Amino acid sequence: MAILGLGTDIVEIDRIEAVISRSGDRLAKRVLSANEWAQYQAHQQPVRFLAKRFAVKEAAAKAFGTGIRNGLAFNQFEVFNDELGKPKLRLWDEAERLAARMGVTSVHVTLADERHYACATVIIES
């Protein structure tokens, strides 16, 4: 196994809250997968939920070395939790095809949030 990429991102939660205040759910609809959207709508702290997902997806785009462009979209990275609560990343569409082309066999995610910030790190391996 070899590390193919590493990405880290930090999000100021107040900035996400300001965007939601200005433009409603537009950002959430652009960033979240269908499964994440359902969780967001039911979540007790939707701003924190969105900030954490945004951080993971930015970190993933950095780990893949592509950013969000050329057919790659935020909603193609889906954050979910395993049975123990560990965050995982599911890839869809172009993100899944890119991972296959790169020979990705494992994606590791770590996620943390505090009062003002959400941060995430994503490591991809072959």
Curated annotation (Swiss-Prot):
One of its GO terms (cellular component) is cytoplasm. Gene3D superfamilies: 4'-phosphopantetheinyl transferase domain. It is found in: Cytoplasm. It is an enzyme of class 2 (transferase). One of its GO terms (molecular function) is magnesium ion binding. It catalyses: apo-[ACP] + CoA = holo-[ACP] + adenosine 3',5'-bisphosphate + H(+). Belongs to the P-Pant transferase superfamily. AcpS family. This is Holo-[acyl-carrier-protein] synthase.
